[in-house]
């Protein structure tokens, strides 16, 4: 089944894309302040049966199938209502991007996609609006479920260690080593201070092999401290214990053993995938709509802030401290610090990824409220050291997200007013 056909099936199950003419005014289910029409259920049933016939898939009997469809419609309606409640809006730009991606994934142009949808009896305008609705529901679900997820640092560390062992098995490191050896009667704190001084010089660019020739008492001192290429399993244990996916050029130490203090340098790495990310330092002002402050009022107030900043009447930081309703950043002149854009909700992420440095955005809305944001700086950061922790976090997040989605949907359903209207009530 093409991707758009899968979406079309969801559309028929969630929104009366094609409605049977006589059934339009027949309410089948009341869901809070919304309704599901019998025509929605009938259309979804016909579509599912037709697709099952084409694919040779067996379906349950009519009563069970009807119950499953009604349950799906109720959950989808509740998710749409949640999106409306927290103010999720999908603008035309994001909608167009999503539909272009659907067309690309099906190797179609937009015109070809539109024609294919029309051949199934659905207008392109209806298709667009249903995709918009499903995007909003998905975004609301993600935002609300994300708040319920708690991942402990120990969970991340434990999984990252397992992943690291699997990945590190084939990685080879070229290691440089400097050993400062204990001698009888020597002040160990003085030796440690010397080791720290050497590390500072190395980090400032001093040549490692020269330092090893000069100071090291280790077994490879006459080779400039060069131990050559080794996998972790081939290294001395005191080396292997310090190697945790660091990248080329990393200086490690000083660390202590029974014979003295050690300094390592990873001269080169083979087989380790490096990870570079862009971090953005931005600042923002957040206003949250209330019964007193409307959406339009929040926009007007933020536009007035922009005018005052440009006129030199106030600084961004002053206004953030005085007015922003994000207490964590307001105290820092609105600054959020260097973060990867993926940490932010989609609308905020889009702004910090696309705004030129030093430019203040127009007011925009997220699930948190109305914002203006300014990008202060961008930087490329090598995250190879933390790549395994990031991967471990994503795995744990996805596991817990899938578990929490089910629980959230059950709670949503349990807390809703749902009334299934029988034939007698409709006829009476």
Swiss-Prot record:
Reactions accelerated catalytically: [protein]-peptidylproline (omega=180) = [protein]-peptidylproline (omega=0)
InterPro entries found in the cross-reference section: OMP_Chaperone_SurA, PPIase_dom_sf, PPIase_PpiC, PPIase_SurA, SurA_N, Trigger_fact/SurA_dom_sf
EC number: 5.2.1.8
UniProt GO MF annotations: peptide binding; peptidyl-prolyl cis-trans isomerase activity; unfolded protein binding
GO annotation terms (biological process): Gram-negative-bacterium-type cell outer membrane assembly; protein folding; protein stabilization
UniProt-listed PANTHER family: CHAPERONE SURA
NCBIfam families per the UniProt record, alphabetical: PRK10770.1
Known role: Chaperone involved in the correct folding and assembly of outer membrane proteins. Recognizes specific patterns of aromatic residues and the orientation of their side chains, which are found more frequently in integral outer membrane proteins. May act in both early periplasmic and late outer membrane-associated steps of protein maturation.
UniProt domain comment: The PPIase activity resides only in the second parvulin domain. The N-terminal region and the C-terminal tail are necessary and sufficient for the chaperone activity of SurA. The PPIase activity is dispensable for SurA to function as a chaperone. The N-terminal region and the C-terminal tail are also required for porin recognition.
Record HAMAP family: Chaperone_SurA (MF_01183)
Full protein name: Chaperone SurA
Species of provenance: Vibrio vulnificus (strain CMCP6)
